[in-house]
Amino acid sequence: VQEEKAMQAVPTAPIDASKFVAYVTERRKKRILFKGEYLMINRSIDMNKCRCEVGSTMRERNPYADTLPYDYNRVILPRLMCDENSHYINASYVNSWLREKAYVVTQAVRTKPMNVEFWRMVWELGSNCIVMLTKVFDFMKVMCLQYWPLTRFTFGDIDVETIDTHTYAHFVFRTFRLTRQTTDGTETRTVKHFHFTEWELDSFPYISAFIELRRRVRQYVEKNPVDAPIIVHCSNGAGRSGAFLAVDANLELMKKTGQLDVYEYAKTLVNSRPHLIDSVDQYQFIYEVLAEAVMCNIQPIQMHQLKDRSSMYKAKKNRELMESQDSHENKLLLHLTQPLRIGDCAGGHRLENRGKNRDVMVVPPDHARPYLQTLHGESKDYTYINAVEVDGFTRKAEFIVTEWPKHSTIDSFWTLIYDHSCHTVVNLSNQGNPRHYPTFIHNKGKASYGPFIVEVINYHQYQAMTSHMVKVMKRVFDRDGWPIPRRSFQTFMISDIMSNAANNQQIETEVRICCVIQVRIWPIENKVPLSTTGLMDVIKMARSWKRRAPDRPESKPTIVMSHNGVSRVGVYIGANICIDQMDIDHEVDVFHAVKMMRINRPQLIDMKDEYKYLYDLMLHWYMTNPEYRIHDKDDAEGEEGSRPSSQSQSLRDK
């Protein structure tokens, strides 16, 4: 009965963008309303129109037999003389709100013959944009073959060359050059590949990352227009692809008409290809993505606009405008930051771990905390430390945020460095009362911390910081649990090493080299540093060491810590994210950097002081790095007539 009532409550007209967030909020309270829409969508399938007679006879060309293209809108390739079935590929045309055949949805490449067919389809369609919504491997299962070359390869009569690759935390963007011999000679085309790596099996991705992917795709398509569809695929060419199409088509509709119509477009999807809307959860996810996109229409700004933004605080009228803007962004961040539930942080709330937390309200979620291994058997839960992984701009879990260790957790702190091969520790707090903030590193010589021997190789004092270059070595124990002297360990017999497993004997020769940077220019009573210069020097030193450190530091995390693991660390991580964005994309997006940082630690960044300081920090970085100036002219020219800046856009939206 409830389902029947819900099915009668489906929307009958497009929804104004100004009312869309409230509409989704109301439906979120009564989830059965989403189910009602979903059931009505499936009832709308025209069985006379949606037939799969051709695809059902091509079993070897369909890795997923339950997702076949409908006959009326399938992609038909030119037939090859050597293969009578070469006209067939598991791909379907799908209309958007504004354009027919705006997309082609296809399945993942699963065999080598499909590899050739895929690139032939890309060429015949004339597409210059491919969106990939699946990983190559997911949970030890091959989801899609790597159908692109690392450098260059020929598929059939099409030569594909990978020109460049840009890796980000949640996606990888590649540029391909396709070359083919035609009757008119050699023809060359450029194709952009947007690979979303965030969407794992049986889960949904971060909404912010999904919106950013769509923004990048749309930005590229608008700058490089061709009369050809966007090719979209996941593993089976169904639900994930449908979600991307629904979001993109409705945001394009909103851009033109100021309205969204998820329900009617979902009916278009299910009549275009099977399972493009494949569950109530996926359907609700589409609504959630669109609601956040509508509510949070704040775009990156060009680097040269940082100076304009900073100068607006000087005049009273403009300062009030900017303060209003900051307040608006603060409210958005508070609304969009999902609080962590106790169940999300079960490890930190266990009885044996409560004493390891300085604040029971600041506990890491289990899915994003770094687990320890070395202290096996030392305590009931030896894996726990109050630390959390935070994504950077180019890599997931690029940073580990933690608090100043307690007397009882100093061993765990060094275990964190050793077990996760951390090459850099940035401590943003000065030592307070030693009773509460014990010394965890010495200035010279060797010292023991639990199972580790830490040797200070170099110690330097600078105006803004001190730095300890340390070598972290794990102690070696014999079969009776006694430390082995280093000299006798070096002469250990091969037979003893071979019997190690049987005797539970610990033998460890690997060491870690780590740079511990201690900030000196951030007084304990100050919310932000006295200036931007000192913190810039700290960031430069840490980034310089990361480039020089041994053992592939680009793949190892940086530990960022403060007295409570909340204040200060957001400024440092946010600055690094924005610097990488400036280096790679020549734009700045402080708002979304903060939003992504808060996913695993919602308390990061104090909006009153740290948020504005982060903008000041980025302006200082921009002004002191002349190499950014070469992009200013191009950015300013491309900006005219294009998207509005962050502040002007969001103020209009209010």
Where are these regions (language model features)?
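Cys-based phosphatases of the PTP/DUSP/CDC25 superfamily and their flanking regulatory architecture
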Residues: 1-654
